Structures are given as C-alpha cells and as structure tokens.
Amino acid sequence: MAAAAMAAAAGGGAGAARSLSRFRGCLAGALLGDCVGSFYEAHDTVDLTSVLRHVQSLEPDPGTPGSERTEALYYTDDTAMARALVQSLLAKEAFDEVDMAHRFAQEYKKDPDRGYGAGVVTVFKKLLNPKCRDVFEPARAQFNGKGSYGNGGAMRVAGISLAYSSVQDVQKFARLSAQLTHASSLGYNGAILQALAVHLALQGESSSEHFLKQLLGHMEDLEGDAQSVLDARELGMEERPYSSRLKKIGELLDQASVTREEVVSELGNGIAAFESVPTAIYCFLRCMEPDPEIPSAFNSLQRTLIYSISLGGDTDTIATMAGAIAGAYYGMDQVPESWQQSCEGYEETDILAQSLHRVFQKS
C-alpha cells in the first residue's frame, strides 16, 4: 500500500499519537468486534451478505432522527477478560500479576456464562483456591506441563498497549499478562504480537510495509529464544511461526485479489493464537483500502470488522483483536454511535479508556 494512502487513512480525527481519541477508539473497536462477531462464532463459513444485513440492523431507524440504540449485543469472555485486565492496571496503576490473576478468576466466578473455554476455567478454579501461592503455576500445569497456545491472552491484551508506551514494557507485560492463563510460548508470543500491533497503531504508522517490518523485526527476535523454538518444533511447526505468517501477510497484501478461502488457508481463523492474531493484523491492513464487496458507506474501521467476521471461525476474537488495532489507529471518530450503543457495557468501556489515558498517558 502506498504510504500516502495509509497516511490519509489514519487521518480521520484520530489526532496525535496516543491521543485520547485513539485510546477510546481502541477499546470501543475491541468491544464492537466482540459483540458483533459473537453472533457468528464457530461458523466455519460466514456469508458476507449476512454480515452486512447484521451490521445494517445496527444503524439508526429511518424516520426516527435522534433516536438512540439500546444495548442488544452481548459481550463474551473476550471483553470480560479485557475489562478485568484494564481494571487491574487502573487499581494498581501498574502491572500486578497477583491482582490481575485474582480479577480474572473473580470475573469468571461472578459471571461464568460468557463462553469461557474449559481449559481456562480449570486455571481460574485453581486461582480461586486460597492455597494458590504462585499465580502462574495453574497455567504452567495445563496440557501436561506444556501450557496453552490459545488466543485468550491476545484477545484481552490491548490495555497493556494503552498503559505502557515503550516497546520493551509492552512486550514484557503482554507476556506476563498472557502467562497467567497461557504458558506456551505459542500462546504468549501471540499476545505480544497483538500488543505490539496495537502499540504501533497508536502511533499512526505511515505505511503497511513499515508496520509489518517493525512487527517482523520484533517477532524474529522473540521467536529466536530456545523455548519458542522448542514449542514450535514439538507441534511440528516451522521455526518462528509468527514471523512466517507476518511475511505471508505481506505477500497477500501484494496480490491484486485474494479470496477469503485463501486467507483462511494461509493464516487461519481458529482459536490457536497463531491461527488468529496474524489474521486480525491482516484484516486491519487489508481494510485500509476499499473492498469492492463492502459498500463504500462503511468507514475503514467498520470495513475491518465486517471483513474479519466474514472469514468465519473464531469470529468474535479475531474481530475484537482487529477492532482494537483499527480503533487505536483511526480513533473514536470512526466508531459509529449507533453501533457502539448497541453493545452491552459500552459506557463503562469508554470510561475505562478515558481513565487509562488520564492515569498512564504522560503529557
């Protein structure tokens, strides 16, 4: 993509790097992706026409100007965990693994019917045990000591990128926050990649090539450690699986036309972090430019959500990750009020974003 086109796409009132608009847009985009995407979760294939009908139902009713939407779309464990993470950061004004782990577990105990996976429920139950002294141990014990490589650490991580402005801190605390539930490097490296994508989006990068180059540089370093190499090898995967998928994203973006089936075949749409985080990044980058199948009335953030959901599979999580990146990039101006007001918890989400900006953003 030409640098000028991407720079123009980033305009849209997002303002300066790490602006309040970007913070609000990030969490609003994540909430939208979860709420809208959950309607299609676990559908192997999703008809684009159906998605377009679904999102058009969120638009204001003609003939009733000024009418507000009411909350109709419920959030899942994706948003529940993302909110608990942010609430911990705000309560401690820093990353605190014990507080965050307890908030995750208490959130599950309070409201268990949000679509949590069986594996993470086991972790939460152990964390709720007063005898638990090491909050990382329950996750390490999963899957015969190999840990989980699911996308649960990545789906909730955006708050880390909002709270910390340095790449080093983003990587460090994304890893630690993910390791509370996902001890495999293939799980926590996915969370780091997602956090880095949000981090870069908050800066307003100037080209997709540069965006990918920066992500690739970070991930090649991270995936070069012995544990990452071992974990990939044990699954029969290529070394540096995230790096290889970032390269594949570049190849797909260079092609004039790519079908949804090709995207799913090359990048995935599953619950594994390596089958969903790169996919979310691709959705964000691809949808900076118009899509002939998506009406031009939809802006870039809306297009990102629509396209990511149309890939099927783990739609709520891929869309919440793509929405977080796009929202951080475009800012609050591209979040449609009627869509936002259709989502459960939208007001609290916005308050959390504003609080994060007030507490963590240095003027």
From Swiss-Prot:
Substrate binds at residues 77, 146-152, 182, 235, 271. GO terms for molecular function: ADP-ribosylserine hydrolase activity; hydrolase activity, hydrolyzing O-glycosyl compounds; magnesium ion binding; O-acetyl-ADP-ribose deacetylase activity; poly(ADP-ribose) glycohydrolase activity. Changing residue 79 to P: In CONDSIAS; severely reduced protein levels in patient fibroblasts; decreased stability and reduced Tm; reduced alpha-helix content and altered secondary structure detected by circular dichroism spectroscopy. The modification Phosphothreonine is found at residue 64. Changing residue 314 to N: Significant loss of activity. It is linked to Neurodegeneration, childhood-onset, stress-induced, with variable ataxia and seizures: An autosomal recessive neurodegenerative disorder characterized by pediatric onset of progressive brain atrophy, developmental regression, and seizures in association with periods of stress, such as infections. Belongs to the ADP-ribosylglycohydrolase family. Monomer. This is ADP-ribosylhydrolase ARH3. It comes from Homo sapiens.
